[in-house]
Amino acid sequence: MILEHRKQEERREDHSKRVVKERQLEANLSCEDRIERKRLLRKLQDEEYGKQIEESLLRAEEDKLFRERQLEQEERMAKELARINNEKLRDEKMRQYIKENSVELRELELKLKSAYLNRERAAQMAEKEAMRYETLREEAMIARTMRDEHELAEMEKEKLEQKKYEEVVRYQQELERQLEEKERKRQEAYEEFLKEKHMVDEIVRKIYMEDQMELQLQLDKMKATQRYIEDFKKQQAEWRRMEREKVEAENRRIIEFAQYQQRKEEDRMAKVREREQAKETLHKMLSEQIELEKQQREKMERAREELCLEEQAEAARQQEIEEMEKRIRQRLELQQTQQEMMAFKKLRLQEEKEEEEAFRQMMMAKFAEDDRIEQMNAQKRRMKQLEHKRAVEQLLEERRQQYLAEQEREEQERAVELEREAQRRKIIEEERQRLLKQHATKLLGYLPKGIFKEEDLEHFDEDFKSNFKQRQADIFSDEGWGDDSQ
């Protein structure tokens, strides 16, 4: 389009130049040459008009050709797009049909679903285990709280008993202080008595010194006083004996009370030891019971898990057996179909040979009958027979060519079927790789054995490869330990 536009511009410029040139020529021409100039000008105009008409026709033809080429190109592009869309749609339909009817993909999907179930079951078991540990922790906290409260109550009780014991000690000390106070007062009374006695002795001595004459009287008085003193000493001795007995009795009561307190303290400590022993025994029994229940729960969980795994394995084995029986039946049916096809083909070949022979005999008989009807001579009859034979051979050759064409068509159909089977296997493998890439990273550690081929790991990153190999090594090591323990 740009080239045509440029050509038109050039043509307009040439035309303008020619017009200017013509006008200049007209201006320079003399009057007597005006007619000639007009004639020449008309001729030039006619030529210019003819050129314009020719150029218009050429442009119209070029535009037509351009539109035709553009239309053809658009039609080719539309056909190509339609072909691509049809192939894409056909490929999608084929993929969808293969995905829905492929035994391998159904087995892979069942294995992936089983892996998801295993992961969900493991998560549920982990959650149950966490809940069980949380329950045990709460029970341990409750037992610890009860033990702390019991110890606090025992401490409070011990404090009360200690307080009572301290009060008893204070009472004993107060009693001893009172006894000491009594002893001090008694000693003061005795000293007062000694002072009085000393005063009496002094009075007696003065009396004795002042009045010897009255000695006999005073002697009697002194005897009386002596008796009084002896009575006083006897009373004092009796009072001291009674005080001593009282103190001894008080000491015995204090000792008995102390012994009673000691026995009570020993009984309390024995009860505390018995309670501690009973508490330890109860704690040990609870721990053993909790451990036994834990082992029983773990045993039940393992048994349940083993039973579930055995059921899954049995279901998988049953499914594999059913699929194997199905494949065997399909293979037997295919073999039977092939045998029937071979027998049918053999029978058809035999029938075709018989039909050819019957057709040959029929044609020869017909030709012979025609010959007899025409009552030809021997030479013409031989010529006619040769013509008939060539016609029959030509018909047989046409039938052989038709048979070969059918054989070639069957070979082409088998090749197409093989190509279709290869395409189906390719689609199955691509879909299998897609499912593995989509789900394997989420189900690492829960995938069943045999789901991966050796070349499948090449489609994953290094992290997945290392984790997968580590999981496999752990599984093999666990199996080895299990064998050793057995």
Swiss-Prot record:
- GO cellular component, as recorded: axonemal microtubule; axoneme; motile cilium; nucleus
Q: Where in the cell is it found?
A: Nucleus; Cytoplasm, Cytoskeleton, Cilium axoneme; Cytoplasm, Cytoskeleton, Flagellum axoneme
GO annotation (BP), single: cilium organization
Q: Does the keyword Hydrolase apply?
A: no
Q: Which residues form a coiled coil?
A: 52-198, 230-440
Q: Which InterPro entries match?
A: MNS1, TPH_dom
Keyword set includes Nucleus: yes
**Source domain of life:** Eukaryota
User: Which key words tag this protein in UniProt?
Assistant: Cell projection, Cilium, Coiled coil, Cytoplasm, Cytoskeleton, Flagellum, Meiosis, Nucleus
**Pfam families reported for this sequence:** TPH
Name the job this protein performs. Microtubule inner protein (MIP) part of the dynein-decorated doublet microtubules (DMTs) in cilia axoneme, which is required for motile cilia beating. May play a role in the control of meiotic division and germ cell differentiation through regulation of pairing and recombination during meiosis. Required for sperm flagella assembly. May play a role in the assembly and function of the outer dynein arm-docking complex (ODA-DC). ODA-DC mediates outer dynein arms (ODA) binding onto the axonemal doublet microtubules.
Family as reported in the entry's similarity comment = Belongs to the MNS1 family.
State the PANTHER family in the record: MEIOSIS-SPECIFIC NUCLEAR STRUCTURAL PROTEIN 1 (PTHR19265:SF0)
What protein name applies here?
Meiosis-specific nuclear structural protein 1
